[in-house]
Amino acid sequence: EEIRYSMSVFKDKILLITGGTGSFGNAVLRRFLRSDIKEIRIFSRDEKKQDDMRHHLQAQYPEVASKVKFYIGNVREKQSVDIAMRGVDYVFSAAALKQVPSCEFFPMEATMTNVVGTNNVLLSAIEHGVKNVVVLSTDKAAYPINAMGISKALMEKVAIAKGRELGSGAATTICCTRYGNVMCSRGSVIPLWVEQMEQGKPITITDP
């Protein structure tokens, strides 16, 4: 009863998931497919991942696959975000560069996606009257020691500043949520360990 009640707020609503082909997007999509939600929009850069997701939905969830619409774009480009944002009620802002080594080698790329890109999503959501935006952060944003964590911490500051700027009673509510390592997600340690064991290699463990 509690689960059905909690999902009732999404009845006949439109949900946008930026970075929707990632680990989070896939999990959320499965959760919402069986609800009374009107439409789920998947926004991402990778047409191959979108095509794979589309075929998977048609094969596994044929009766509800039509609820899912796909938008190719980049959060760094607000114009493409605006197109996907039209008519949206709720947003999960999950588009990010999250691989720690990649962010270390290319910190400006991490900043452009995680900070500027998220700001574009927030601006677009506010302009289009979206009810709620949930910005996905990470536990690495607490006392950050690497570029990924720093970019996510700054992203949180941007979201908090936007919420403060809107003030209480605004049409759009912005919130951030932090979560830790997700088991078997892309870039997580478990797939690496499995691969190393299958190849008979030593398991690598780091000490911060």
Predicted features, each with a name:
Residues 1-13:
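A short, basic/flexible loop-to-alpha-helix module at the beginning of a structural domain
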Residues 13-35:
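N-terminal Rossmann NAD(P)H-binding glycine-rich loop of SDR-like oxidoreductase domains
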Residues 18, 85-94, 135:
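Rossmann-fold scaffold of SDR-type NAD(P)-dependent oxidoreductases
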Residues 36-52:
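Conserved glycine-rich Rossmann-like NAD(P)H-binding loop of the short-chain dehydrogenase/reductase
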Residues 44, 71-72, 112:
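Conserved residues in the N-terminal Rossmann fold of short-chain dehydrogenase/reductase
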Residues 63-90:
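Conserved Rossmann-fold cofactor-binding substructure of NAD(P)-dependent oxidoreductases
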Residues 93, 97-157, 161, 172:
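Conserved Rossmann-fold NAD(P)-dependent oxidoreductase catalytic core, especially the SDR/UDP-sugar
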Residues 147-148, 153-208:
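NAD(P)-dependent short-chain dehydrogenase/reductase
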